[in-house]
A protein has these predicted regions:
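Amphipathic helical hotspot of TIR/SEFIR-family domains
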Residues: 91-111
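Canonical P-loop GTPase G-domain recognition
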Residues: 111-114, 119-158
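Conserved G1/Walker A P-loop phosphate-binding module
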Residues: 1-81, 89-92, 131
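Conserved beta-strand segments of the P-loop GTPase G domain that flank and frequently precede/overlap
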Residues: 86-90, 116-118
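Conserved nucleotide-binding/hydrolysis micro-motifs of P-loop NTPases
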Residues: 35-36, 59-61, 92-94, 120-124, ...
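Well-ordered alpha-helical segments embedded in enzymatic catalytic cores
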Residues: 70-77, 98-102, 153
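Conserved strand-to-helix beginnings and helix N-cap segments that scaffold or border functional pockets
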Residues: 68, 96-100, 126-129
Length: 158
């Protein structure tokens, strides 16, 4: 079908919203609270005449609870299986240590990945966006998975 691309990030940064936007259907459930996505969710999609398989993953946390460790294991499997990765962050909140931890996990995976700075349409993002560039990811894009802002430029990069 095409390369496998995993969407990875903290809980509630918009991974499922981006997944739905890219595949063009509301397949993944979306909520205003973290932890709804637990298992990997796969779907094929076509972007600019290229076929992809996308994987929506649960959010990576610092929690040591058994439940969160199971979600982390599922996400690590998706990272391992993927041909490329989308690191999704939420610019409506400040960058934090978990963003740096996830960036380190992705860098150590040896896979190609892009930084996608979501929720860039929010007032809060104006104060936070520049901080995410400190992660040092070569290819970075500012988007809104909710309203489509910046999606064309981002999709061209895939």
């Amino acid at each position: 079908m095409g390369p496998l691309i995993a969407i990875v990030g903290r809980p509630n940064v918009g991974k499922s919203s981006l997944f739905n936007k890219l595949i063009g259907e509301d397949v993944a459930l979306i909520a205003d609270y973290p932890g709804l996505t637990r298992d990997r969710n796969y779907s094929g999609c076509k972007i600019d005449n290229s076929n992809y398989i996308l994987v929506d993953t649960g959010g990576i946390t610092n929690s040591s609870s058994k439940f969160d460790q199971l979600i982390l294991a599922e996400t690590q499997k998706a990272i391992s299986d993927a041909d490329g990765l989308i690191f999704l962050v939420d610019s409506s909140s400040s960058i934090n240590q978990l963003d740096f931890k996830i960036n380190d996990i992705l860098r150590k995976s040896g896979k190609n990945y892009v930084l996608v700075i979501n929720k860039s349409e929010t007032k809060e993002s104006k104060n936070n966006i520049s901080d995410f560039y400190s992660l040092g990811v070569k290819n970075s894009f500012e988007i809104s998975a909710k309203n489509g802002l910046g999606m064309r430029n981002f999709k061209t990069s895939l």
